[in-house]
Amino acid sequence: MVEKRVQPLARDAMAYVLAGGRGSRLKELTDRRAKPAVYFGGKARIIDFALSNALNSGIRRIGVATQYKAHSLIRHMQRGWNFFRPERNESFDILPASQRVSETQWYEGTADAVYQNIDIIEDYGVEYMVILAGDHVYKMDYEWMLQQHVDSGADVTIGCLEVPRMEAVGFGVMHVNEKDEIIAFVEKPADPPPIPDKPDFALASMGIYVFHTKFLLDALRRDAADPNSSRDFGKDIIPYIVKNGKAVAHRFAKSCVRSDFEHEPYWRDVGTIDAYWQANIDLTAIVPELDIYDKSWPIWTYAEITPPAKFVHDDEDRRGSATSSVVSGDCIISGASLNNSLLFTGVRANSFSKLEGAVILPNVKIGRRAQLKNVVIDHGVVIPEGLVVGEDPKLDAKRFRRTESGICLITQPMIDKLDI
C-alpha cells in the first residue's frame, strides 16, 4: 500500500453528511426518528460511524444535512458532537432543510441537499469535498480515498464494495476497466457487470463521493438548471460525470479500518429490520468483524453518564447472567438470563425472564418470566410479565412486526394493544 503524504489531504477537506432520509424499511423504528438517528451498538447512533470516520481520518470541517423528523438526530449531535473549536479551524454545522434557495423548496434529493448550502460550502474554502451517507455502519479512513482521487486526476472518486455479482442487483453498480476507471454506472442491473480481475464479483456504490470542491459546485449548479433532473447524485450527477468526465472507483478494501485482516471489509446498510438486528448481534461475537473496541479508531458519540451494569441473584432458577452478550451501563439484570443479546443503557430485566438473540434499545423494562427470542425492542417499551415471543410465528405476526426470517420488532403501541 502506498504511504500517505506528509501533509494529509483530509486537512483541506470538508465532510458533508447526508442525514435526511427516513429509512422506511425499518418500519416503526423510524416513526419517531430519522434512520441516521436510530440506536446502534449499545450506545451509539448510526450516524456516529460516518462522523467518526471523518474525524478519525483527520477531517475537521463537517456539515450534516437533516430533514425527516430531525429533532432526535439534532439533539444527539448537539450533545455528542459539540467539541469542535473554530479557533483551531474546526467546525461542525447542522444544516436542516431551511428553504435557503427557494422559499417553498425543501431538499428534493441528495444533490439538492448539497446545492442548497453552496454558500456555506464556499465559506469553508476547502479544496476537497467528501460526500457521505449518514445511515451506514462501517469503519473507513477517507484519507486513502482522497489520495487516490488526487493521484488519479479524477473528477469524482466513488467508494465501492466488491460484492458477489448476483447480490449486486439491488445496488448502483460500476462497470470499470483494468485501471478502475468507471466506464458506465448502472442502477440496480439485472445482469451486473463483473470486475475485470474478479469475474464473479461486481463493484457496488457505497454512496461515498470525493470531489474537488470547485468541480462539485459547478456540477451542482449545472444540475440545478436542468428541469428534468431529479436532483440526485446516483441518478443525475454521477451518470453525467461518467459520460462526460473522469470517474474512478475506490475499492473499500483499500481503506477499510480492520483489527483483523482475515475478516472481510465490514460495511452494512442496516436498512431493514433483519439487517439491523443482525448487525447488532454481530457485535456479540468473540472477535466481531466490526471492532468497536479498537481505541485507535474509536466510534465517537454522546457519552451519557451512567452507573455500571449490575447482575443480581444467584439462585438455581433465578440467576442474573449473560453469555455472548453486550450489556451497556445502567442495566440491571435481576435474576434474568441473557444469551447472544445486546442491551442498550438503562434496561431492566426482571427475575426468571430469558432473552435469546435480543436487541434491546434504551430504558426498556422486561417483566418477570418474559421469554423473548430474536427480537428488536424499541426505546422505552415496557414488556409485561410472562410475555412469550419467538415460539409461535402466527401469534407473533398477529401481535408484532415479524419479518420472514422470524425477527420481531416490538414497540409500545403494539404492547398496548395486547389482550393479555
Curated annotation (Swiss-Prot):
It catalyses: alpha-D-glucose 1-phosphate + ATP + H(+) = ADP-alpha-D-glucose + diphosphate. One of its GO terms (molecular function) is glucose-1-phosphate adenylyltransferase activity. It comes from the Bacteria. Homotetramer. Keywords: ATP-binding, Carbohydrate metabolism, Glycogen biosynthesis, Glycogen metabolism, Nucleotide-binding, Nucleotidyltransferase, Transferase. The keyword Hydrolase does not apply. Gene3D superfamilies: Hexapeptide repeat proteins, Spore Coat Polysaccharide Biosynthesis Protein SpsA, Chain A. Belongs to the bacterial/plant glucose-1-phosphate adenylyltransferase family. This is Glucose-1-phosphate adenylyltransferase. Pathway: Glycan biosynthesis; glycogen biosynthesis. Involved in the biosynthesis of ADP-glucose, a building block required for the elongation reactions to produce glycogen. Catalyzes the reaction between ATP and alpha-D-glucose 1-phosphate (G1P) to produce pyrophosphate and ADP-Glc. Its EC number is 2.7.7.27. The gene is glgC. It holds the Pfam family NTP_transferase. InterPro entries: ADP-Glc_PPase, ADP_Glu_pyroP_CS, GlgC_bac, GlmU/GlgC-like_hexapep, NTP_transferase_dom, Nucleotide-diphossugar_trans, Trimer_LpxA-like_sf. GO terms for biological process: glycogen biosynthetic process. Alpha-D-glucose 1-phosphate binds at Y107, G172, E187, K188, S205.
